Amino acid sequence: MTESTQAALRAAGLDPAQVRRVIENALVEDLGPDFLDVTSVATIPAEQSDTADLVARADGVLAGLAVATAVFELVGEVSGFGRTVEVSELARDGERVARGDVLATVTGPTRLLLTAERTALNLLCRMSGVATHTRAWADALAGTKAMVLDTRKTTPGLRALEKYAVRAGGGTNKRMGLYDVAMIKDNHKLAAGSITAAYRRVREAFPEVPVQVEVTTVAEAVEAVEAGADFLLCDNMTPEVLAEAVAAVGDRAELEATGGLTLEVAGRYAATGVDFLSVGALTHSSPILDIALDLRSE
């Protein structure tokens, strides 16, 4: 992986070493332990080189070009081609793209291009799909104080990439995992005996960790904020009940709505004055953005 690609990943808030591990695992899935693309080896001379275009097949929002570039570079590193691949980006992450737009050109050994193609596209299409879906939510909330948040409902192994795609689409990350924010949910409350008891146990064990509490009623919201919670996750509240919770809590904590949210009702929930709308579908149900790799004909 080149220094410029690593720098681009860092600028996106991604760890190059982590991205490398993701790509290497994906390549092993596709190429097997011997790192072999039998079709390309059989049909394409080793010395042949070509240029290919990454082309959008649908309108959307782009995310993951640096990750796709890293795929081509890593295939070149480990495949023994002995020649470098050059990627020229013609669009940027976070930009809207239209069907037919050329997003980047890739030049290098033809075998390398086709061997890397599917892994590069799988990641690029997935990330761009998440960014596209997120942008629809961000647009739906435009003009309100509410922001759209992702969740931990991510594809195993791809959380960092998918959460970056949410950011590229105009969304916000709340927590990366179980380690950076405490989330007291219904099972924790049952185990501890009450919201207040659960909060106190978390605060005693981890004094510096932010604490969020899941609540389903206005009374629970008041109990949680009086206990000291930093954030409230208001689960499956109607807009009317949520507005009551917002009024009861005031500025003592940030409130996040979740549960059954759709683009059609986003405006109603945002109008309550809630700070965030938490949408698991950003990462667990976003369709891909169709992108293809087209070899240029001579």
Model regions: which residues?
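Short, structured secondary-structure boundary patches
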Residues: D235, A253-A257, S297-E298
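Short, charged, intrinsically disordered terminal tails
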Residues: A281-E298
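Short secondary-structure boundary segments
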Residues: N236, G259, A281
